[in-house]
Amino acid sequence: RIAFDEGRVEELNSIVHPLVIAEQARWAAEIAAKDSLAVAVVESALVFETKHAASAEDPAPWRTRFDRIVVVTAPEEQRRWRYIQRVAGLDEAAAAADFDRRNAAQWTDERKAAMADYVIANDDSLEELRDEVQTLWEILKRESEERAGEAM
């Protein structure tokens, strides 16, 4: 919260993002070495927003890091409510303000969805979300198998 309060988000991100990205690459390589058909999933709120490794030659470095990108969307009020419910140590007003600061630093769902390979709307029941995730999981596994078959 200090980084948001003092306007030092970029400084914090410039320290954290390269380390996280390097660890993701190491982890993905480890998984691929064990099973070429494996589907690995990375959860990240700032896939598109991170400035690490973006350049004039490669303005979309996430495309070299991920085979597929899935964006999960939800209405802003629903996301705010969920955030307030799970954040510890803040009263409701402070948690809502913290959500608003974080949300302002992220691209809109619409902007992210336009760049995604798949979009899951998380605006219904948990059961519905699980069904959508399971369906997508099967698609991703099938795509992995098809790519492996093409490589042979």
Regions found by a protein language model. Name each.
Residues 1-11, 15, 19:
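N-terminal phosphate/diphosphate-binding loop that engages ATP/GTP or pyrophosphate donors
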Residues 23-27, 53-63, 88-146, 151-152:
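Small-molecule kinase domains that catalyze NTP-dependent phosphoryl transfer to phosphate-bearing small molecules
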Residues 12, 41, 120:
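Residue-level signature of catalytic and energy-coupling elements of molecular machines
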Residues 15-16, 74-75, 103-104, 124:
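Short beta->alpha linker loops
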Residues 7, 18-19, 77-78, 107, ...:
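Short alpha-helical
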Residues 5, 31-35, 123:
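Short coil/turn helix-boundary motifs
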Residues 22-34, 40-85:
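ATP-dependent NMP and nucleoside kinases share a basic, alpha-helical "lid"
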